[in-house]
Amino acid sequence: MLHTLMTSPFRCDLSAILRLLAAGDDVLLLQDGVIAALDGSAPLEALLKAPINLYVLKEDLEARGLLAQISPRATVVGYTDFIQLAVRNPQQMAW
């Protein structure tokens, strides 16, 4: 399943979202959700403990000036990769 997190991790119930993730799920951070991938942040550490694949949309990082502050443990992807994730995951949940 593809989970897209579009809100800041400080404006949503990230712990509830984490409980709904299953092993092997893809999680894409976009819009203000990219804040969750800041290197050393508590939201990032929580996401990395989950058995998921973590992706961050490059264009949204650039729009917020955060590209250099993102953890190397998160995979930065573009819109083409976003489409591939959507095709690979027929079931999707937007947060």
From Swiss-Prot:
Subcellular location, record wording: Cytoplasm
Entry protein name: Protein TusB
Pfam family, one: DsrH
Quaternary organization: Heterohexamer, formed by a dimer of trimers. The hexameric TusBCD complex contains 2 copies each of TusB, TusC and TusD. The TusBCD complex interacts with TusE.
Family: Belongs to the DsrH/TusB family.
GO aspect biological process, one term: tRNA wobble position uridine thiolation
One term under GO cellular component: sulfurtransferase complex
SUPFAM superfamilies (UniProt xref): DsrEFH-like (SSF75169)
Top-level taxon of origin: Bacteria
Species this chain originates from: Erwinia tasmaniensis (strain DSM 17950 / CFBP 7177 / CIP 109463 / NCPPB 4357 / Et1/99)
Lineage: Bacteria, Pseudomonadati, Pseudomonadota, Gammaproteobacteria, Enterobacterales
Record InterPro entries: DsrEFH-like, Sulphur_relay_TusB, Sulphur_relay_TusB/DsrH
Described function: Part of a sulfur-relay system required for 2-thiolation of 5-methylaminomethyl-2-thiouridine (mnm(5)s(2)U) at tRNA wobble positions.
Keywords, sorted A to Z: Cytoplasm, tRNA processing
